[in-house]
Amino acid sequence: MTDRPIMTTSAGAPIPDNQNSLTAGERGPILMQDYQLIEKLSHQNRERIPERAVHAKGWGAYGTLTITGDISRYTKAKVLQPGAQTPMLARFSTVAGELGAADAERDVRGFALKFYTQEGNWDLVGNNTPVFFVRDPLKFPDFIHTQKRHPRTHLRSATAMWDFWSLSPESLHQVTILMSDRGLPTDVRHINGYGSHTYSFWNDAGERYWVKFHFKTMQGHKHWTNAEAEQVIGRTRESTQEDLFSAIENGEFPKWKVQVQIMPELDADKTPYNPFDLTKVWPHADYPPIDIGVMELNRNPENYFTEVENAAFSPSNIVPGIGFSPDKMLQARIFSYADAHRHRLGTHYESIPVNQPKCPVHHYHRDGQMNVYGGIKTGNPDAYYEPNSFNGPVEQPSAKEPPLCISGNADRYNHRIGNDDYSQPRALFNLFDAAQKQRLFSNIAAAMKGVPGFIVERQLGHFKLIHPEYEAGVRKALKDAHGYDANTIALNEKITAAE
């Protein structure tokens, strides 16, 4: 008699034979009554769930957030009080690639964090860049379509990408970062993370502050060149997963220094830029980063599917002391992320173990697909509505945010009017040394291969407005790499396009 567990069906019945199907005779057909075979095949048919529409390829690990600084004057959030230690889950990802995409591709890296606080889950869903390609969420689906496959060729389209970017000058800041060294990191241990959006802090006195979150890698930065990345992909498509998993297994726990930039609420009316614009950064000279703690990743998941693929991060998950802002992109993500999880994982995705809060949960949600938590979470089956007289959960007024002053007429305002989309990319470009600029030029030229000349010229016009050297450098790189000549190629394509 073995001491190993007995194999069973999903209903718990022991399985006598997992090697041979039930047939009519030794060579006969399979019988429909072979419920073991039918269960096994039907389950296999349903093993895959819809992949994320964006950020599909990802890597994750558990860790701890430790707060060492004191920002208690700005926020009442317990997770951010001095000495607080909070378990957390991180998921990194590429944006455009599907689940089977190679890790070593030039792309923005997602930087999503879930903190299991004593006041509920707090999710910070950012990237390895402090800005993004668009500032109005109405353009987000259009942008993502340019990063995905062409509906006819089923290939990624450089033309679609550069056409959209060249028609969207607000993308210049992020495009410059993407095409720089930091657009192709060797792995995720050597990248920074950013909340990207402007969030808010608020304290017991009812004071609000605007805040930006930064996570600075303590491992330093490492990047591939395009040529190096091609060699890496030739060896393995899982370079980032291999690196992160192996490092943690070997006790080489990656760490990030956690910083915040804090802006008094009324300063938002005084800055020369819109502090709620996702395509802009706050100058460090005006709002210096404050060190508040360290994030460490120190444990690999036991099962990737249940703990990383099933993980659901949403900016709507906040805790008392942390709030939102008028950032338009953030406002849209508050809805869209949770809605995407309901589509991908089901109505009750927050009851999946990796998404469950560590604190008690009480609410009046009921029924629905995959309701596996035993009914409404009120503690009393008679308290299935609110208000009630049967000791059901009640509100906590102390969790109420201070009032937010808003003004203006409802309208579809042109977000480009009065917006400077060139100064901040120029400041970034001026920080690059000569070698970094040359790699920027070469990377852009490589990414523009096959793009029609009239689109190239439109984009070069934007680069020139950033800095004449930017435009000249990319133009030369295009000629060196592809023999591009605006006087011939662009002119012919303009005529073709007009016809």
From Swiss-Prot:
Predominant subcellular localization, coarse grouping: periplasm
Cofactor(s) demanded: heme
Single Gene Ontology MF annotation: catalase activity
Protein location: Periplasm
Catalytic activity: 2 H2O2 = O2 + 2 H2O
Keywords annotated in UniProt: Heme, Hydrogen peroxide, Iron, Metal-binding, Oxidoreductase, Periplasm, Peroxidase
Polar residues compositional bias, start-end: 7-23
Enzyme class: oxidoreductase
Iron is among the record's keywords: yes
Record's keyword annotation contains Iron: yes
Annotated segments matching region Disordered: 1-25
Annotated catalytic residues: H55, N127
GO biological process: hydrogen peroxide catabolic process; response to hydrogen peroxide
InterPro entries per the UniProt record, alphabetical: Catalase, Catalase_3, Catalase_clade1/3, Catalase_core, Catalase_haem_BS, Catalase_immune_responsive, Catalase_sf
Any one cellular-component term (Gene Ontology): periplasmic space
Binding site for heme: Y337
Family named by the database record: Belongs to the catalase family.
Job description of the protein: Decomposes hydrogen peroxide into water and oxygen; serves to protect cells from the toxic effects of hydrogen peroxide.
Assembly with partners or alone: Homotetramer.
PANTHER family assigned: CATALASE
Protein's recorded name: Catalase
Organism: Brucella abortus biovar 1 (strain 9-941)
